């Protein structure tokens, strides 16, 4: 029976479900080989993949150019096209990040906890999940980010990208990831790409807890929330990155130069989740600081959404196709109201306080409950590579225990207790 408001899942007989289950089965069969390969082999494969990104650059850029051309013809907005596009510089950055990840020492996978009164020794271990799924936006670099993190965590991956990036993602898997794995004796089936466009493939992926117990979901808020609901109903653990939007609070102690720098550095890209989305200004200096911020924004081609607002205060412009070049502005009465507004009106991804008064900054930091809080630093830093020196699978904004903020490979593991006889 289907109840009003219930969320339906891809039928098990559908072509999408069959294809995704087959991909998950291949990944599950490959997962023991990833675990057995060990750290040195995985790290070597990541270094080889970095080399292939550079070596195969012409083919990869050509595949991406075809995706961008098709998306442009279909009317994709500028901010989304920016996320879809691979440039030689971005390809180089992807390669560098793989090398950094390969060179990153792994944290200990086992630690001693205690001796029981009866003498047994208790240890805590981190073990691989097995197969990890990922659903992400039409953003080719995420294919590499997620695959590399999952492999570093000794698991296999099933990836589903936005349909606009399917050609780019396919090229990355076939020309870079698979050959790199094969070169070091790791099963090439360890990274699977769902070959079908449309949301049915994503819905199928979150409905296979027997094969894919953990799925990282990122992208548009509405779709991500739906997939989280479907995953919960199926028994799949979903790490969801549904909404974003950075907040910048301008305190009365902030000077013009500080405001100019933070507004500028927070808006270098408009199609990303951690960009400036909501600008809050302390009421006593609203008339003084608004023109300072406005000049920087207008120079970047960004329109200010000024009060009164017909939209929600935390409306995420990065997800509003065709309207990405907007920032919402509102006055607030002090640091506490600013922090509470940022937490209440947005996803709680990230907020920055611009202030030269340390007491004000500490007040804002203590009052804000979101994932990342910054003092005189742009929210664009809430990124796995920028913040932690590691690529990320996504940014988790849950208000529950578990990995929160940029999710990297140490977060993609299971806790296991091992009890040994007395020494």
Where are these regions (language model features)?
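Short, ordered loop/turn segments at secondary-structure junctions
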Residues: 161-164, 196, 220-221, 243, ...
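Conserved C-terminal structural/oligomerization subdomain of aldehyde/semialdehyde dehydrogenase
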Residues: 316-423
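N-terminal Rossmann-like NAD(P)+-binding subdomain of aldehyde/semialdehyde dehydrogenases
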Residues: 2-121, 149
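ALDH superfamily catalytic-core signature
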Residues: 16-18, 55, 137-141, 145-156, ...
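Rossmann-like NAD(P) dinucleotide-binding subdomain of oxidoreductase/dehydrogenase enzymes
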Residues: 103, 110-257
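Flexible, glycine/charged-enriched surface loops at secondary-structure junctions
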Residues: 37-44, 62, 184-191, 270, ...
